[in-house]
Amino acid sequence: QGRMTIIPPEKTDDGKITIGGLDANIWMTKYGNVYTDCKAEDFMGKLGFAWGDLVTVKFLDKTLTLPVVPTYSYVDSGKPAIIVEKDADGKPTGYVSMAINMGNFAETYELAKKHTNEDKTWYWTAWEGVTYPVEVTFKMAEKGGYMAEYIMHDLQRTNDRADYPNLSDAEFGNFRNIATTGMGKDVLYRGSSPINPELGRNTYVDAALKQAGVNVIMNLANSQEEAEAYEGFADTYYSGHKVIYLNLGVDFSAPEFQKGLAEGLRFFAANKGTYYVHCTEGKDRAGFVSALLECLMGATYDEVVADYMVTYYNYYGVEPGTDKYNAIANSNIIKTLQNAFGVEDLSKADLQKGAKDYMKAIGLTDAEITDLMVNLGYVAPVEPATPSKPATGDAGIVVYLGLGVMALAGGV
């Protein structure tokens, strides 16, 4: 995420590396990734760094020791890194950036503040006291010091359908029904973008949406303007249905993410239908939101982890039971939900309570949570009349149903 082609101003030969400004999608991405004017090939060539090295980075009054990796997913959730992307041949490409996995580097390290407009477009302003360009220095801390973790996180995928002969078209698009405990039958689906052609999967996903009868969609990745600009958008099944466009980043603790997610959950609560949650890959933002909804509806710990990890099989062939599988789960969805729910051991937590408390904390009311659960297939238990109590007909049933629905917002 946050990948782009940047063309910074022509660099002077003074040997300095800088973050040149605040321009959106040149120096700063919507996720808070920060680009420098150092070419990746120079970083690896002239400066002598390599993937798997630990490097000391200095800027402003900050000193960090960061691993050099090809993408944010090579570090645990919440951890920063130096990003040097790989091209199709495995060579360094583009410009050196810094990012936090599921976080916002620019704001965390007080470089810039993000602002979001009502139409979900965004822009950056300098942090108080910061002027641009900002000089950055890189110095080797430990050659190969991150290599063990690097190998564990090393994941390879392609966007070529022919490379995934064992997957159905829907699986290739990372599209699937969520069928965890408590979830209604064929009510909620998740996956990659049905409109963004970047991954070569959008047409497969759009076809899967149609087959599933999806008609209420939460788009975590785009603004409406951005979505409608994709080639062929108007001809998609997707475009003819109810969609909320949230254009969210990946810092799940950020107020703007939580505000946007609350809007998305209210949208689901207010619109009955067959639901779809997606971002770009259907991996991080959609992975978190899907897990949250699974927990809300009564899923077990094992179910939540297993559903999240299906994505890593669909894209990367990561098999359950392997060290890589466990490392990815522990450093991503388990850690993310522990932070969201404020618990130390997710496997021992009351996941439904955690989800409800989280939703209340980001602004949902008990009534909205109840509506959301009912729309996702929650059926309130109807208690049988006791022998000592005369049958009360419809009125009695109404009492029991009422108690069941009232309990939704509590500890059901």
PLM segments and residue spans:
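Long, compositionally biased stretches
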Residues: 2-120, 127-133
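Extracellular/luminal Pro/Thr/Ser-rich low-complexity repeat and linker "mucin-like" segments
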Residues: 15-34, 183, 258-259, 263-267, ...
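The Walker A (P-loop) glycine that initiates the GxxxxGKT/S ATP-binding motif of P-loop NTPases
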Residues: 277-279
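Ser/Thr-glycine-rich phosphate-binding loops at phosphate-binding pockets of nucleotides
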Residues: 281, 285-286
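Extracellular Ser/Thr-rich, low-complexity/disordered mucin-like segments
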Residues: 385-401
